[in-house]
Amino acid sequence: MSVNYSEDNNRTAVVVGLQFGDEGKGKITDFLSESYDVVVRFNGGTNAGHTVVVGNETYKFHLLPSGSLRTKVVVLGSGMVIDPQSLISEIEIVKKNNSNLAVVVSSNAHVVTKIHKYLDVEEEKIRSSMVIGTTAQGIGPTYEDKYARSGLRMIDLLDYKTIIEKLDIIYRMHENLLSRSEFSDPSVRENLAKELYSYGQELKKYMYYTDILINKLYNEGRTILFEGAQGVLLDPDFGFYPYVTSSNTISASSYTGTGFSMRKIKKVIGVAKAYVSKVGAGPFPTELNDDLAKKIRDAGGEYGTTTGRPRRVGWLDVPLLKYAVQIDDVDEIALTKVDTLGILHTIKVCYSYELDGKQIDYIPKHISEVSRVKPLYEEFEGWGDLSSSLLHPKMRKWEIPQQLRRYIDFIEEQIGRPVTIISSGKDRSKTVRIER
């Protein structure tokens, strides 16, 4: 079938995070997924935590795309690293609510094992003063093995002999850290291999070459939404290295993580909180460390979906947001947690930095420089409770409360991109598309 690449701008889209992750991508993907036939996730693993609230029910996704409750087909791309036990549990839960959902898992995606989780903890100990704050889900070590060409893939789980051979290779590659662990015992590795083989038998009905499938569905005219994990500021190439994640998180990663060309993507939707939050160590120019931080954290429920750890919070950082929009080539912005800031009388936004007494128009990359930047702030009046203001799924901009509208106008002027979606509260229904 011949495809006209100039057709419908909503046919394919990518949802990405514009901050340090936890921006609310799950809720936005769920909101958008009703309009898409297929939702594809392309990076990360169980280190991601996407929460969707529907009525009285709360769903927490770590592997399955957040669109799993509303769409017809979900795909886990080859750029992901998959904990098979967690995946089986998630599929069981989501099938109870969307029994007709088709789940497809890339045969080429790499597998997280108990060995990788052990290594994650041990490697974090070695980092000492440069501790990252890993989720200890085994994500980093799994990607290490992937790029060392010694990793275990989903398709390998169908052959017991291959599993044993690869586990032995992984052990020898990391013997300096594993020699004092239970995994030094060959019988323990054999039992792990049996466990992984049993997972493979259970998951084989979901496995396929997803690059072929996604392109086939596209050529058949299906609408496809790509969902990223984490955020651009955690990207190993464009974030504050080494305080980053182990997979690429930018919009272009949808190409390398699925085999679907970026030339066919019609829209990039960047998700940002109305403030900033972060889990783990690393630079955070606008971070708050006083009672106000606790007030925002508690109001916004800023505790990690995967770890339960309290998140660091701070004011919205326009320089970082501009940078993220540029890297991701964002077309429009979804702004989340606007209700959380509404509780404050005065709200600040960082519009620029000073470094060593001079105003700068770039993002320093050296950690020592970032630690010295001084945020310059613009102040805004709070907009109060939004529960009686944002009542419809679509609203004209002039219908939005004036103080919130001024905040949005400032962001749009600074970033040069429209805010097309605003989200308040946890529930799916508390999401508004701004019509112009």
Swiss-Prot record:
Which cofactor does this sequence's record say it needs? Mg(2+)
Q: Which residues form a coiled coil?
A: none
Which UniProt keywords are listed? Answer: Cytoplasm, GTP-binding, Ligase, Magnesium, Metal-binding, Nucleotide-binding, Purine biosynthesis
Q: Which residues form the active site?
A: D22 (proton acceptor), H50 (proton donor)
Q: Where does IMP bind?
A: D22, E23, G24, K25, N47, A48, G49, H50, T135, R149, Q230, T245, R309
Under Enzyme Commission nomenclature, its number is: 6.3.4.4
Could you say which enzyme class this protein belongs to? Answer: ligase
UniProt cofactor note: Binds 1 Mg(2+) ion per subunit.
Q: Name one GO biological process term.
A: 'de novo' AMP biosynthetic process
Gene3D superfamilies this protein is in? Adenylosuccinate Synthetase, subunit A, domain 1 (3.40.440.10), Adenylosuccinate Synthetase, subunit A, domain 2 (1.10.300.10), Adenylosuccinate Synthetase, subunit A, domain 3 (3.90.170.10)
| Pfam families from the UniProt entry | Adenylsucc_synt
Q: Which PROSITE patterns match?
A: ADENYLOSUCCIN_SYN_1, ADENYLOSUCCIN_SYN_2
Q: Which residues does the annotation say bind Mg(2+)?
A: D22, G49
Q: What metabolic or biological pathway is this protein involved in?
A: Purine metabolism; AMP biosynthesis via de novo pathway; AMP from IMP: step 1/2
Q: Where along this sequence does the record place binding of GTP? A: 21-27, 49-51, 311, 337-339, 423-425
NCBIfam families assigned: PRK01117.1, purA
Family label = Belongs to the adenylosuccinate synthetase family.
Q: What does this protein do?
A: Plays an important role in the de novo pathway of purine nucleotide biosynthesis. Catalyzes the first committed step in the biosynthesis of AMP from IMP.
The name this protein goes by in its record: Adenylosuccinate synthetase
Classification of source organism: Archaea, Methanobacteriati, Thermoplasmatota, Thermoplasmata, Thermoplasmatales
